[in-house]
């Protein structure tokens, strides 16, 4: 196994150790966003580096997000797309100009986000989804996406 693949697998293993609101043994108020707010602050507020199209609803969000992303890309904008869940590869969740984020970029960004998240003790709860969202926002900022 090559070193980049090993690092990728190590990052995936660490990500899986972060709990989810749904499976946590401790009840939490999921409306409180202190954990993700602190993490984004410590990352330099990557969510402020690009314009966001937020898609909500029951069905068709992934397809709608992909279509909007492609249309913006055709117009010459650097576009990112963050969707959930993934089917096979976690990198399906984060696309840059219509392509899955590379393992190298994913590992670099995830390593930084996880390092900061690990440094918190006795602070608000962070979930698997919070961590992945922060990774996506950081990737989009680092890769100079204009629309996400």
What are these model-predicted stretches?
Residues 1-51:
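Positively charged, low-complexity intrinsically disordered leader regions
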């Amino acid at each position: 196994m090559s070193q980049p693949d090993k690092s990728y697998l190590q990052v995936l293993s660490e990500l899986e150790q972060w709990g989810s609101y749904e499976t946590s043994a401790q009840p939490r108020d999921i409306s409180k966003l202190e954990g993700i707010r602190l993490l984004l602050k410590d990352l330099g507020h990557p969510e402020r580096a690009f314009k966001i199209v937020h898609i909500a609803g029951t069905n068709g969000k992934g397809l709608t997000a992909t279509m909007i992303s492609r249309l913006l890309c055709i117009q010459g904008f650097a576009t990112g797309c963050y969707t959930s869940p993934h089917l096979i590869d976690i990198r399906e969740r984060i696309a840059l100009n219509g392509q899955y984020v590379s393992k190298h970029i994913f590992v670099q960004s995830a390593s930084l986000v996880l390092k900061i998240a690990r440094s918190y003790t006795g602070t608000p709860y962070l979930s698997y989804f919070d961590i992945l969202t922060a990774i996506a926002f950081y990737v989009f900022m680092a890769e100079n996406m204009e629309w996400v």
